[in-house]
Amino acid sequence: MTESRTVYVRVKPTEEFAEDFVKIGEDGQSVTIKSLTKPKRSFLKHQISSYSFQFASILQNTDQQSMFNLTTKPAIDNAIGGVSSCILCNGGPGSGKTHTLNGPQNNYAERGLIPRTIGYIFQRLATQPELGITVRCSFIEFLNEQLFDVLNAFNGQPPKELKIVEAKNGRISVKNLFMPIIKDEQSGLERLFMGNALRALNPIHLQTTSLFTLWFDSDIPQPTTEKPLHTKLHFVDMASPVKFETSNRESEEFHRQASINRTMTVLERVLIATEHIPYRSCPLTHFLKDSLCNRCIIAHVSFDSESL
């Protein structure tokens, strides 16, 4: 399978769309944003009056099923076919990242990418039992350059320090990470919902980067690769970049904000690097090392007048 690097933009619905400043191209792949600031000095010339960006697609008023078909279904097929993949959602606070990934728990029609993925996987595997694929899940938070096991509360064991391990073949795993087997859609959804519920108990945790991963393993040689299967599919809910709201460099808030911004900077460097790629510069990129070659980034934006 070929490497895939795709970027989509999902626009949050609004009744106050800033049409005077934002123009989405008729092709549905480009957007032009006018500069909102006026030059302070009238004698300056050649100032940039607008910025244009190109994407695989700009998604407006797109339903959850269409989002899944376009952005996630190919990644699932890759993972089951032998290539680890990554779905990465980023955007500002309230831009809709978590809605895209999870959706409301009590509205089946609006369920997000992860619940739809779990359902699709077991529908597909039910038709191919000869593949002998076992599915596991894990749920990790990244806070202040450290990894935390969200699902460990259901492990019945005291928490242990998580350590990212890289095998000689380049495969990434996490030592001491709780990775329960999920045998069907219901058990997978239970793990996801329990993890989300635990995170919601502490508001600070909702401001961290979280990573829900599905692991696929089989000792049976697979038809696409003629090798045993050991892949993963990551869903990353990126913490939003933040402005420093405190000057106290010793405070926990300062360190948390600095960690979020540093992770975003390292991730950007990894995504644009062509030669030496600094995967080990932060835990998130190190963990995603064997999956970022096949990635789908969903950038969430709000083009309402108030946000601009």
Tell what function each PLM region has:
Residues 306-308:
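Long, amphipathic alpha-helical segments that form or neighbor coiled-coils/leucine zippers used
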